[in-house]
Regions:
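Conserved C-terminal active-site "lid" loop/helix of NAD(P)H-dependent oxidoreductases
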Residues: 212, 248, 271-302, 307-308, ...
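Mid/C-terminal beta-alpha module of Rossmann-like enzyme folds, strongest
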Residues: 221-280, 311-314
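Catalytic helix-loop patch of NAD(P)-dependent Rossmann-fold dehydrogenases
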Residues: 99, 132-177, 181, 198-201
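N-terminal Rossmann NAD(P)H-binding glycine-rich loop of SDR-like oxidoreductase domains
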Residues: 17-37
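Conserved Rossmann-fold NAD(P)-dependent oxidoreductase catalytic core, especially the SDR/UDP-sugar
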Residues: 106-149
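NAD(P)H-binding glycine-rich loop region in Rossmannoid oxidoreductase-like domains
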Residues: 60-103, 107, 111, 128-129
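Substrate-positioning beta->alpha
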Residues: 181-187, 201-224, 230-234
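Amphipathic terminal alpha-helices
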Residues: 2-3, 16, 304-316
Length: 316
């Protein structure tokens, strides 16, 4: 375990936060935005790379073997654990998800517990609570029913955190959008950029999304709140959108009309199946709506309205 940059001097009274996953989609954004809010960041890296801009210091170490993390967590006030295997990395065996998303998280949490870290923020997923679609509105009170290896690994990590003495919080993130996004959201951006009218005006299923900036607000809020948390919290933009509304917002950002038309859903499914695309788009036919009311009770105020955020995304 070795530092690649000197420790920040203790003269600053601002919180020192250890961040994992700083090279990922969400981690990079947190690394850029949290220092603007006064946080000092210590980035935990698995291998020696260029020191990311915006961090107070960096430490090299393997999160799957955190027995020697005492130095890395020295003087740390809080941890944001963003590292892990993403849902977009399909085709991996369940053992890989369990190793990197569950076991590494719990071992790291135990190291944080020994280091007397005050708060452990785990970036979980709404998929820890349900499959790609769900009946009704998801709340933290509903029994979790993940349907794939990714979701099961995230839920198991949450359960492992609950067995520690840490003041932890698991942020169950809805589908996140922002610069550099991959996976399903990248597919929707590609659809919106296509020059063709789209036969999705009749799809009424609604989908909860989450702007990166609203996620930063949530992380800031749970780092600052004084009362113990020790629970999962759903993080989603307040108003879900239909697929048509998502595409319309993106095309508005491109300065174009929505260009959507109606095709009966069974016919649309048949056409996608014939083209070999039905599996990739099947989740779009069902709703996944998540309620962030519990987080709002902690005075979380999302800054980005979803339609405006989607319009801005495609302009970048």
């Amino acid at each position: 375990m070795s530092h690649t940059a000197p420790k920040a001097q203790k003269q600053s009274l601002k919180p020192l936060v250890a961040l994992t996953g700083a090279t990922g989609f969400i981690g990079q954004y947190l690394l850029r935005e949290l220092p603007k809010r006064g946080y000092r960041l210590r980035v935990l890296l698995r291998r020696p790379t260029m020191l990311p801009e915006g961090c107070a210091s960096a430490v090299i170490g393997d999160l799957a073997k955190p027995y020697n993390m005492a130095e890395a967590l020295s003087d740390v006030d809080a941890v944001i654990h963003s590292a892990g295997i993403a849902s977009t990395m399909s085709g991996l065996p369940e053992d890989d998800y369990r190793l990197f998303n569950t076991e590494a998280t719990v071992k790291f949490a135990r190291a944080a517990e020994r280091a007397r870290v005050k708060r452990f923020v785990f970036l979980s997923s709404i998929r820890a609570q349900s499959g790609p679609t769900a009946d009704g509105v998801l709340t933290e009170e509903r029994e979790p029913r993940p349907t794939d290896a990714y979701g099961r690994s995230k839920l198991a990590a949450e359960q492992g955190l609950a067995d520690t003495r840490l003041d932890w919080v698991a942020l169950r993130l809805a589908l996140v959008y922002g610069p550099g996004v991959e996976g399903n959201m990248a597919r929707l951006i590609k659809l919106a950029r296509s020059p063709y009218p789209l036969p999705i005006a009749g799809l009424k299923a609604e989908h909860s999304l989450l702007a990166l900036d609203n996620l930063v607000e949530a992380v800031d809020k749970v780092l600052a709140v004084q009362q113990p948390l020790k629970r999962p919290l759903i993080v989603a933009d307040p108003k879900p959108l239909t697929l048509g509304a998502i595409i319309a917002a993106m095309r508005q950002g491109l300065g174009r009309r929505a260009a959507l038309f109606y095709v009966p859903k069974p016919l649309l499914k048949s056409a996608l199946r014939a083209a070999g695309h039905v599996d990739g788009y099947e989740p779009l036919f069902g709703s996944l709506v998540a309620d962030p009311s519990a987080l709002a009770k902690l005075n979380w105020v999302p800054r980005v309205e979803t339609r405006a955020g989607l319009a801005a995304l495609v302009r970048k």
